Amino acid sequence: MHDECTPQQTMSSIQDTKAADIAARGELNVIETATVSPTNGEESHYTNQVQLEKNKTHMSSALVEKENNTSLNGRVLGQEESQNKMFPDNAENEDDKQIEHMTVENINGNREETHGIIQTTETEIQETSESPREEMTTSSIICDISKKYINSTLPNDSENIKHKNNIMEKEYLDVLSDVTGPQVSCYITAPSYVLQQLECRIINHMSSLIVGDNEELVSNVITIECSDKEKRVPFPIGIAIPFTARYRGNYRDIMVKVCDINLQSSYLNPNSLEGMKGGYKGTCASVKVYKLGIFSVVSCLKKESFTVTKKGLALKSSMDSRISLNYPPGVFTSPVLVQLKIQPVDPALVAHLKAQQDTFYSVQSTSPLIHIQHPSTYPFQKPVTLFLPCSPYLDKNNLGSEIDHKRRASATINRITPSYFNRTKIASIRKPRKNASECLKLLGFRSQDSGWCGLDDVVKTIQSGLVSVELYEHLERFIVLHLSSTMDNSHLVTFVKSLEEAMLSTTACIVLSHQKDNPHRIAVLVVPSKDLSQVLKDLHLEGFGGPPEPSRHFQVREGEQLLLRFTGNIFASSNGKDYGKDYTLIFHLQRKPRLELQIKEVDEFGNYSCPHYKGTIVVYKVPKGKIVPNLNQSLVINENHSQLPICKLPLKLPKHKKLINRPQSTKRVSKDPVEALWDNLLHWLAEELSEENAESLSSTLPLRRSTIQLIKLKNPDDLTEQIHEFLCFWKKSLPTFTDKLRLLARHLRKIGRSDLAEELKFKWENKVFTEPQQCFDVAPE
């Protein structure tokens, strides 16, 4: 759990100092503000005032002594304000930093008095870390700086002087893939010379490791780095990140999450949610940052912080007026900071869990899940009373609204799939009735006890739908269950664990669609079940559609990664070049995870018995433990797929017609007059036969079907050539001394063409050559 803290403020004001007794002999007085880096790895800034004296002729020790004894009419005032909000458990502290810019005024050496003028700029710095650090204050010291240090520092500082007022805003673009165009990654407001050194990249492949429990990613994940590692960035700089939040409510808030290279995170509260930024018309989360790293915008549970003093506190939650807390006087021995989060429970989830297991039947309803944080070093001296809403039965109206897939004000999500909704409805909607055995049960989570436990006799009913809870010890989170009859504590703990897991999960499915104009292009999406119909309509408008049907429904958590493996005779590529890879989809509820791929067959001669190529997309869940983070490329996934796939999608690809480029046909004409006559007669006969006659003749002649198919394939558009080919093939298959004319005449009579048989006999006997309609190239034997 991380804190959002307001930046600490450190101000320094330095009044002008007038050197009254220094003669104007070309001396130059410079008062400079320098930043010295601390040792031991701690980040702290010290403001050093350095008085430099430079004489044109010489600098003597006597002059230094004279100047030190000079009465200065002025003073240096330093004020520091620091507010530290800290949990002893979390050990989250704030470091104060101060960066001051200097201005050097040229002094005329011809005048007798020299005035040094310093202009200081106050800045604010806040840094929240995961490890405890000692708070370091800003101090002012006076020291001597060697000539070497001056020569190396002054050019840098002069550059800062030159550009300190040249604040600009730059739009950073990045290209996610070869298919999509560039999109806005962020806007950075900083001095122009700094903007030239900053680089911004979109690293959405890291989102699995960025998002946490009860968080929903609503923007790209970006990383901002400085190309010149030795360049000092004048923090703070402004960053605006575009985001799109579809679901907002009283219980959720928009925060900017900042992670370092080790994925240690902190949160920043946006100072504005702008509707317009440059050419981008969407919404941007604007923050001031004091370090570079990995940035993202997340929707998380809203945190409410308040301080409980020795006098106690009575507070009504701003998120839900039905929830209030009463800390009696003396509950703590000293003031402590308390943080509260409220997570509403969807009645449909309770109904679904009851339908899944009969042991949960006694659960009628629940209160919201309360996350509360107290310092463990301050135990309760007196019981703390909380008032929570807890309806005595599941609200039929609330359940109906979830059926219609409408977003509740609490920003909960309908995760009930249509396949089991009927059973859920029957198991959940019952008439409310009074039962003497009805009871209320409090279940709390204590980290030191490693889990949930049941607490007895701490819940009381105030009025219908409202209960009071007395806490005698620290609980990280708790929930009140309204039971129709008593249940064993082990069953209650199992129910709460299942409910907590269901609140972190969403029912979703995989949608696979082919582009209608180009079946080799597919779109693969992970879609929440409640959005399925709308997504299918949108795909249809984009020109995608067709089989297969969406996959079966499964449970997936925010940021969970799905591995898509192509098997069978079809593989895919994201750029049309590299085929045979596996691809990943990262599920984010408020974003639209989508892959557009090019597919083709592995073996063009495969699936020969089918009119299309066949393959399968096998989908696996990838646990976070198997993901190796890498900023520069996609996440490396360990190849141990011991678990079963969550779903499979059949993939089909129509076979394309093969264009065979054949050379021009040539016929060998024999010089033997008998063979030449036979060839002429067979060609004449092929021209005289119709398609029906040819089919009948081919069936009567002793020819194999494969031979006829091969002849048709060679000449698909010329019937005469087909008939001539199989007649020649039949003639060659006969023995040499066979009476071919008599056999052919017999087959012609069988198909009812006795006229052609008689004319064939006449032409053979009289050696009549018929002029062919098509000329052939003659190849020498």
Curated annotation (Swiss-Prot):
A Gene Ontology BP annotation from the UniProt entry: signal transduction
InterPro entries (alphabetical): DEATH-like_dom_sf (IPR011029), Death_dom (IPR000488), ZU5_dom (IPR000906)
Pfam family, one: Death
Location of the Death domain: 679-764
Ranges for domain ZU5: 167-301, 302-483
Record PROSITE patterns: DEATH_DOMAIN, ZU5
Coiled coil: none
Domain of life: Eukaryota
The protein, known as: Death domain-containing protein 1
